Design a protein with these regions (language model features):
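Alpha/beta-hydrolase fold catalytic core
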Residues: 267, 272-328, 332-335
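Short beta-strand to alpha-helix junction loop
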Residues: 70-88, 100, 183, 253-262, ...
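Feature captures the FAD/FMN-dependent oxidoreductase FAD-binding
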Residues: 73-144, 320
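Short hydrophobic core segments
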Residues: 11, 130-143, 180-183, 326, ...
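C-terminal active-site-capping segments
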Residues: 397, 401-483
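Glycine/threonine-rich phosphate-binding loop and adjacent beta-strand/alpha-helix elements that clamp
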Residues: 51, 338, 342-410
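Beta1-alpha1 glycine-rich phosphate/pyrophosphate-binding loop at the start
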Residues: 6-11, 15-99, 207-208, 271-277
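Rossmann-like dinucleotide-binding core of oxidoreductases
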Residues: 2-5, 9-10, 15, 19-20, ...
Length: 483
């Protein structure tokens, strides 16, 4: 089998993989690397999801790259605009020729004899080959791109209309004048409902339980003022700092004073929807704020749709699908031409690759994460896992920066291997992510764990991580250099 040698192998050409490539171009210009992408186009999430209204659920000042300002006045950005931003970034940093599309890594094995990762690569066209890489950065995201999560609905096949899955949206679906049911209460559902309601005959948002929803302007007035008086980069940096601090504050207060934030969010919803709307049934969850991710709606678009005659919300369980729609547990029959099961993601670690160390399969659930990016006792591997309580890209950027610093440190020491060493798994660990979202709870058995103390604790706090990752010392008693 033909073999290629690289310094760095990046797996995944989405937001994280592109960002890692840009960091290498800027900070390690002599490094040989390739970005392998299994799909036919780059962009990851922002190319895969094409449902109506697809947009960011974080502001683009923190969701955009630190090194490349987001210049659109809309800081809650439509998906196509984000995809354009990614493609422009690829061209600006000369990554187009380094990205190999329709090229899947199926197996990844660390060879201690060679001090290299050996990746088995399957291009859609051409022969299978191997890549021997000094360092691997997994930027595959956290969910299965081929299959979303779909509960077993009784009578699912009885429905005679169209079932449109958000993860695989039918390109030719015309929903104008149609009756639509959107099942779900998360970010996807609250995005789809107001968009489809613009032209559909009626949209019903059917949720098993409510989520916290936070309305904010689609255009940041503070950033808008800064852009008028400052150069783009300064306006971007200051807006970014403001939003980072604001998100950390909101999350911190939500954890310390959940009742205060709950009352605040309830008041905002009541102010938007009016006293006659049953906010407590539909927008007042039983869990605390930020125990699950807060759903962002720009300019109150979901509330506006619900106040119109084109959309309504039902909080109930699905009993079964029928030929003409579905029936809820309370007995309500809801007719529809189209049903959209916005029921969540299916977690997948490492893009489904079979990972092994010296031919011994790696079960990451029995390992801790080091600084939220490396895996205990696994050499020369970084896994980009962004924030779930803030913008994903903030952590992806820190990870990319750290990988570059770590490679430079290895060069200075004249070594080929670096491993975060752990003698034994501690008796007490934490979940990698603090959120209690269903898709994360379902996947707890397949994710690495967080320790209780640094550097094994996954802080999920940008300021703490920045100090640790960007400015922390390598000689911390954990990282072992050798080879």
């Amino acid at each position: 089998m033909q073999r290629e040698n690289l310094d760095v192998l990046i797996i995944g050409a989405g937001l994280s993989g592109i960002g890692q490539g840009c960091h290498l171009v800027q900070k390690r210009p002599g490094t040989t690397f390739a970005i392998l992408e299994a799909r036919e186009r780059l962009g990851g999430t922002w190319d895969l999801f094409r449902y109506p209204g697809i947009r960011s659920d974080s502001d683009m000042f923190t969701f955009g790259y630190r090194f490349r300002p987001w210049k659109s006045p809309k800081d809650i950005a439509p998906g196509p605009d984000i995809l354009t931003y990614l493609n422009e970034t690829v061209d600006e940093y000369g990554l187009r020729d380094r990205i190999r599309l329709q090229t899947r890594v199926t197996d990844l094995n660390w060879s201690s004899a060679e001090n290299r990762w050996i990746a088995t690569v399957h291009p859609d066209k051409g022969d299978t080959y191997e890549i021997a890489a000094r360092f691997v950065v997994s930027c595959t995201g956290y969910y299965n791109y081929d299959h979303g999560y779909l509960p077993e609905f009784e009578g699912y096949d009885d429905f005679k209309g169209v079932i449109a899955h958000p993860q695989h949206w039918p390109e030719d679906l015309d929903y104008a004048g149609k009756r639509v049911i959107v099942i779900g209460s998360g970010a996807t559902a609250v995005t789809i409902v107001p968009t489809m309601a613009e032209t559909a005959a009626h949209v019903t948002m059917l949720q098993r339980s409510p989520s916290y929803v936070f309305s904010r302007p689609g255009v940041d007035k503070f950033a808008d003022i800064l852009r008028r008086v400052l150069p783009w980069r300064w306006a971007y940096k200051l807006s970014r700092v403001k939003n980072v601090l604001l998100s950390i504050y909101l999350y911190s207060v939500s954890q310390r004073k959940p009742d205060k934030i709950r009352a605040y969010l309830r008041k905002l919803a009541k102010d938007e929807l009016g006293e006659d709307f049953d906010v407590d049934t539909h927008f007042n969850p039983t869990y605390g704020p930020w125990d699950q991710r807060l759903c962002l709606i720009p300019d109150g678009d979901l509330y506006k749709a619900l106040k119109s005659d084109r959309a309504d919300i039902v909080t109930d369980h699905v009993e079964r699908f029928t030929t003409t729609g579905l029936r809820t547990k309370s007995g309500q029959e809801i007719d529809a031409d189209i049903i959209v099961p916005a029921t969540g993601l299916q977690i997948q670690f490492g893009g489904g690759m079979a990972v092994s160390v010296d031919n011994q399969p790696l079960d990451v659930a029995n390992h801790l994460v080091y600084r939220g990016m490396m895996v205990s006792n696994v050499p020369n591997l970084a896994v980009t896992f962004g924030y779930t309580n803030a913008s994903w890209t903030l952590k992806a950027d820190l990870t990319a920066d750290y990988v570059c610093r770590l490679l430079t440190q290895m060069d200075k020491r004249g070594v080929e291997v670096v491993t975060p060493k752990l003698d034994a798994m501690p008796d007490k660990t934490q979940a990698l992510v603090g959120l209690q979202s269903g898709y994360l709870l379902r996947a707890s058995h397949m994710l690495p764990k967080s320790g209780l103390e640094s550097p094994w604790k996954n802080h999920e706090n940008y300021i703490s991580d920045m100090m640790s990752i960007r400015y922390g010392k390598f000689d911390d008693g954990v990282l072992a250099f050798g080879g």
